[in-house]
């Protein structure tokens, strides 16, 4: 029986959420070209994949003291909600609230940069789909800290192990937890 990690890695292939093109490659948000493209938005559209992400994240966060989790719009919304729902179903004492960090504050309504159930002093875990350069995680961490949240951990579905992303995030005092690495995806067929 394959482990949950192996099942999730295979799920990337089954859902066509992992693309590999050695000749043409894919342009990443950083502008660099990579032979791999990881599309967690497609992955998270599948209930069976969300169940695996929820299970693995819940296990990975067992020892982390936290009140809430969230990250940058749009990708982090389904990830945070999935983890929160799975954790609560597994243990009703784990009522992790969720939030989303907007890319920019709204120019109407309350003009918030962060939406969700947060309070200054809350211990927050920042979630993201893929870690490459660390730029989106660092932006979410900075915004969360500016809102008074205490951020000591980040969780990503896939660490691409490129551009020193993990090192950059951990230099800001944030421990990175990854459910999978790019090696898991390239070796799962």
Q: Which stretches of residues belong to each language-model region?
A:
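Active-site-facing substrate-recognition patch
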Residues: 1-65
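PRPP-dependent phosphoribosyltransferase catalytic core
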Residues: 2-14, 142-189
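Short helix-loop-beta connector
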Residues: 62-67, 119-121
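Short acidic, glycine/proline-enriched helix-loop-strand junctions
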Residues: 63-64, 79-96, 167-182
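Short glycine-rich phosphate-binding loop at a beta-alpha junction
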Residues: 66-75, 155-156
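Generic enzyme active-site microenvironment
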Residues: 71, 126-127
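Short, glycine/charge-rich flexible loops or terminal/linker lids adjacent to PRPP-binding catalytic cores
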Residues: 79-125, 135-138
